[in-house]
Amino acid sequence: MTRSTTPEGLRETILTISRDLLNEGGPSSLSMREVARRAGCTHQAPYHYFRGREAILVALVEEGYRALERALREAREMSEGRAPQDTTRAAGHAYLACALANPGVFRIMFRS
C-alpha cells in the first residue's frame, strides 16, 4: 500500500489495513507496527489518528454497525409492501452480506 498524502487519507488507509488484518487473522493479528508497515509510514504515525489498537477496533466496530444499519434499512425499504416473511428474508440476506464482507469486524461486533 502506498503512503497517503492527506491526513484523512492516511486515517482511512489505517482503517482499511486494520480491517484487512482482522479478516486475515483475527484480532491477534492487529498491531500498530504492522499497520504502519503496511501503510508505508513511520511506526508512530498511526498513533496520530488513534490512541492505540483498541481505538482502531472501536472505530471499525462503529463503522461496522453503521454499515449493518444501512444494509438493513435498505432491505426494509426494498421489501416494503411485501409479505412479512419477504422482509425477514431480505433482512437476513443483508445481515449475512455484511458478515461475509468483513468477517473479522463482524466477529468483534458480536463477540460475547
Q: Which role fits each region the language model picked out?
A:
Residues M1-G9, D20, E80-G81:
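N-terminal intrinsically disordered/low-complexity leader segments
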